[in-house]
Structures are given as structure tokens and as C-alpha cells.
Amino acid sequence: MAAKEIIFSDVARSKLVEGVNILANAVKVTLGPKGRNVVLERSFGSPVVTKDGVSVAKEIELPDRVQNIGAQLVKEVASRTSDAAGDGTTTATVLAQAIVREGQKYVAAGLNPLDLKRGIDKAVVAAIDELKKISKPTTTSKEIAQVATISANGEESIGQRIAEAIDRVGKEGVITVEDGKSLDDELDVVEGLQFDRGYLSPYFINDQDKQVAVLDNPYVLLHDKKVSNIRDLLPVLEQVAKASRPLLIIAEDVEGEALATLVVNNIRGILKTVAVKAPGFGDRRKALLEDIAILTGGQVIAEETGLTLEKATLAELGQAKRIEVGKENTTVIDGAGEHKNIEARVKQIRAQIDEASSDYDREKLQERVAKLAGGVAVIKVGGATEIEVKEKKDRVDDALHATRAAVEEGIVPGGGVALIRVRNAISGLKGANADQDAGIKIVLRALEEPLRQIVTNAGEEASVVVAKVAEGSGNFGYNAQTGEYGDLVESGVLDPTKVTRTALQNAASVAALLLTTDATVYEAPKDPAPATSAAGPGAPGAGYDF
């Protein structure tokens, strides 16, 4: 085991605070509409230019081990905020730095760190309660666009694209972000349920231009086993042929004689069919088949339910208005399932999301909800260079997360104004003793810091602006984009309540832990190995410089 070094009290804290300040100073220059870029070196490939706080934080590793521990603690604030709300990482970092800076002064003056922490916690709880009171729900597409625009550092085109995507697929719909192939951003919307399985044979294609198989008003047969014997399928194929409608077969696999017969029937025009593999694996495959069954108003033909292929009737088959099957994807548009059954299924999956223990499971369940409840929108981010596309894509991701947070918990006035209003509302809060009062003062001072930093980045005098905004009420604030005072909600400067709340909670949590730290244990630096000459002491040329 490597040797460890230990430092205590003020020495330990001051080193940790130095690390906090180095990281926070690099991150906070990106805050606000006039925030600056940060260039990140890559060990391979082009450097990355970003205004995303968490991207900057993740890149920072300091050579001094103790300073690096402090930096890692603040990095944790940014990461936690990003994971929970998807945005607000720079605000969280600025708040954490302010709480640590103010708290360090009181600890150095001899106040009890634990009472300071209790005061900080009390002030944060009161601040969050007040934040919820001034929050209002997002109701219009315009508000959604405004939230997205602010999060994308003031780029209106990104805000409009995200608002349009939500309009098209609904608040529950899946919205993904991809690299585009042109200079402009594009929005591609897939209506209905899409899964990542394509046709099993190219002979099923009936639209040669698009290279897809299109089925209008088809039946849908869902089976959880492999189909290789055509005799199993014959009874249901005859019933579908009599109805003169096409058929989509979704099974674990369709192979051998069964697949060959379906292809021949398709080519001869006897019965238009397409066979695809069922999506997913194991238990997830069963769940996805059940989703498709509910969406199309059919049943999964499975031994568990007492149904067999030979005895299947049209009543067990699902139906849809249109199905498109490509090489890699199948899209079911306007399934014939009953709305109440789909809603019940969505509710059931949401309950599973609440109980899911892993992020992967939660993500896959949310994907299923979105596919049942809405559609899938793909925002393709355009740009002239790879660096530009990457930087813009980061901002679109941030804006998308901020928008989802706004839909979830509502919105508050942006530009740091919500925290100023909260500060004014809780300014009369008192703790159980003088040290707790000091903890409350730390938070009251920290709540000004995001506005101060936004104004500083805009090149204005922070103290003057903070004083003027504090004198106002409601949505009155400073718009750093235009340099004017006014109603920020009217001018579209909004923040999601969830982002502001999460940033404050995480910043206070980590900063308070740092203030109550009294010792730091770290690995002792290794002594560099002494340089040895290749030539021994008695060798020719030893001891001479050449």
C-alpha cells in the first residue's frame, strides 16, 4: 500500500478551497448569454470549443493532489446537477464556490462548522420552498421555445427547433439529437411506434425508390417463438388472404421453408406479407411485443397465454393504418388499439420507471412510454465544421434537458433573478444561535452570485445591477443579452424551476461538506528516480560533457 500524507484544519481547507476556485473560475466564464468559450485540448483529434459548464469541469485534473480533491468535489456538483436536471451546471458551480468562499471566512474566524452547516441547510430548505411558490407551469409552445433558447446560450433557432419537436411528438415523445449532413439544423419526425428491426428478406420491398416495404391497412401477427414450418402459418394466412389485406409477421425469427413460402407468395402477388424479427431480447422482447399488441389491438400468440399459431384467428391479430418496414427499422403508424388500453399500459410502465434501480433500465422504460404515448423526433444539428457541430450539439442537448425540466416542474424568471427574489423573501430567517445565523447569511450572499457572474461576463458593474434588481419585484430583472432592465418573463428570459432548485441543493450539499472537513488524506508524491548514466564511473568518457 502506498504511503499517505495527512494535512489538518486550516491548511487542509485552504488547499481544498484553492482547488474549488481554480475549477470554478474556469467554468463560470461560460455563464449567461455573454459568457465566453473555453477551448479544451484533446490528446487526439481537434480541440473542442464549448460553453457547456459540465464539459469544462470534467476536463480539469490539477497537478496538486489536495487542490485536485477540492476540484473533484465541485466537479461532483456539476455532474449531479447535469444528471438530475440536464442543465444548470455552471450555476451550481458558481453557487458552490460562493458558499465555500463565504463559509471559509467564518470557519477561519472560529465559528462552529457544524452550526454553519445547519444554518446553510435551513436557508436552502426555505429558499426551495420560496422557489416553488414563484414557479409557474409551462403552458405554451412559446415558453418552451424561450426556455430552450436561454439554455442554448441565446440561439433562437435551437429553441424553435425544440419547441417544434415537442409540438409534433408531444411532451412524452422521444427527441434525439444527431449530427446533420448540411449547414442548417433539420427536424425529422417519425410518427407512431418505431423499433429497430427491418425486413428479413429484401424481396419484401414494394417501394423501390425508398427501398422499403409499405403495408396499407395491414393485419399484424405477433409470435414469441421461431417460425420455420409453413404449416403452422397456413390457417392464419388463408384467413388474411380471404380478407384481401396485407400481413406483417413479427416473431423471434422466421426462417427456412416458412420464409421462402412468404417470399414466393409476395413475388407472385398472392398475399402481400412482410416478416421481421421481434425487437429486444429476453424479458424485454416479451414486454415490447406486448406494447405492440396493445398499440395495434391484437394479442401475442404465446403458449403462456394458451394461444397457438395453428388456431390463431383474425380476432387475435393487431391492425394499423399503415406500416413501413425498412432495412433496419419498422414503423407502425396509427395502430388500432383502444386509447384506454394504451393509457393503462403507459401508466403501468411509469410505475416500473419509479421502481427501476439502474439508469439503463429507466432509460429503456422511458423510451417505451414515449413510443406508446407520442412519436420520435430527430434533431439533426448542422454546421460547417466538425468542431462547430460538436459544440452546437452540446448546447442542443442542454436545451433539450432544460425544456424537459421546465415541462416537469415549471419555470421561474431567469438571469439569476429568481434567486434574488428568493433571497429577499427569506432575508428575515433566523437560526437557533449566532453560528446558524451566519450559515443563513452565507446562503443569502451566495444567492446573488449567479446574477453577479452573468453581469460580469456581460462587461457591466455587478454591484450596481444587483442592487437595482433587488429593489424591484416580481419578474423585474436585468437582460444581459440586450443590456436592459424589464420584465424578464415578457422578454423570454426563463429558467426551469427544476434546474435552479437542483443547482442550489447540490451546491449547498457539497460546499457544506467541504466546510466541515478538518483533515485530508492523500497519496504521498513519489520521489523521482535518480538519473543514472549509461556509462559506468570507469567507462571512457564518464564525467565529461560532450
Swiss-Prot record:
Molecular function terms from GO: ATP binding; ATP-dependent protein folding chaperone; isomerase activity; unfolded protein binding
Gene Ontology BP, a term: protein refolding
EC numbers, comma separated: 5.6.1.7
CDD domains linked to this entry: GroEL
Binding site for ATP: 30-33, 51, 87-91, 415, 495
Reactions accelerated catalytically: ATP + H2O + a folded polypeptide = ADP + phosphate + an unfolded polypeptide
Keywords, comma-separated and alphabetical: ATP-binding, Chaperone, Cytoplasm, Isomerase, Nucleotide-binding
PROSITE patterns named in the record: CHAPERONINS_CPN60
Location relative to the cell: Cytoplasm
InterPro entries registered for this protein in UniProt: Chaperonin_Cpn60_CS, Cpn60/GroEL, Cpn60/GroEL/TCP-1, GroEL-like_apical_dom_sf, GROEL-like_equatorial_sf, TCP-1-like_intermed_sf
Pfam families: Cpn60_TCP1
GO cellular component, one term: cytoplasm
Function: Together with its co-chaperonin GroES, plays an essential role in assisting protein folding. The GroEL-GroES system forms a nano-cage that allows encapsulation of the non-native substrate proteins and provides a physical environment optimized to promote and accelerate protein folding.
Family affiliation: Belongs to the chaperonin (HSP60) family.
Assembly, per entry: Forms a cylinder of 14 subunits composed of two heptameric rings stacked back-to-back. Interacts with the co-chaperonin GroES.
Name of the protein in its database record: Chaperonin GroEL 5
Organism (species): Paraburkholderia xenovorans (strain LB400)
